[in-house]
């Protein structure tokens, strides 16, 4: 890997994102599509941009992402995590601000499995007393 790019792996739920940070003008490319095309929801786009806005580096980098697995929310979270890790690789002094914002920690919440005898993970069948 060349010294001109920084790499970060991000994960959230079942989504995994590989993020490459290169000096540039602020283009974000996800699976060879622009951010606006890939994410229809504005909230997902906002989540992806959060670490860049916090570190005031929106126009400093071009970001290339390959993401797989999960849904829209999980993929957005995985990309955010990957961008955060790549930014820390680029400049370790950003770690404190990113940590305080809560972007460094991997969100460990996963879907709880369905149990036998229950309708969902915790929903029980209706109880009849008589």
From Swiss-Prot:
Highest rank taxon of the organism: Bacteria
The UniProt record lists the keyword Ribosomal protein: yes
A cellular-component GO term for this protein: cytosolic small ribosomal subunit
One function term, GO molecular function aspect: structural constituent of ribosome
GO biological process, one term: translation
Entries under PROSITE patterns matching the protein: RIBOSOMAL_S9
Keywords linked to the UniProt accession: Ribonucleoprotein, Ribosomal protein
SUPFAM superfamilies listed in its UniProt record: Ribosomal protein S5 domain 2-like
Keyword Ribonucleoprotein annotated: yes
Family of the protein in this entry: Belongs to the universal ribosomal protein uS9 family.
Name assigned to this protein: Small ribosomal subunit protein uS9
Source organism: Pseudomonas putida (strain ATCC 47054 / DSM 6125 / CFBP 8728 / NCIMB 11950 / KT2440)
């Amino acid at each position: 890997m060349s010294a001109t790019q920084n790499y970060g792996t991000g994960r959230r739920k079942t989504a995994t994102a590989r993020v490459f940070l290169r000096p540039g003008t602020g283009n974000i490319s996800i699976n060879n599509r622009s951010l606006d095309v890939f994410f229809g929801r504005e909230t997902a786009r906002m989540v992806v941009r959060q670490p860049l806005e916090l570190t005031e580096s929106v126009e400093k980098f071009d970001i290339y992402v390959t993401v797989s697995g999960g849904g829209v929310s999980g993929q957005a979270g995985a990309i955010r995590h990957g961008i955060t890790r790549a930014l820390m690789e680029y400049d370790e002094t950003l770690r404190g601000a990113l940590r305080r914002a809560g972007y460094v920690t991997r969100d460990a919440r996963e879907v709880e499995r369905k149990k036998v005898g229950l309708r969902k993970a915790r929903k029980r069948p209706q109880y009849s007393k008589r």
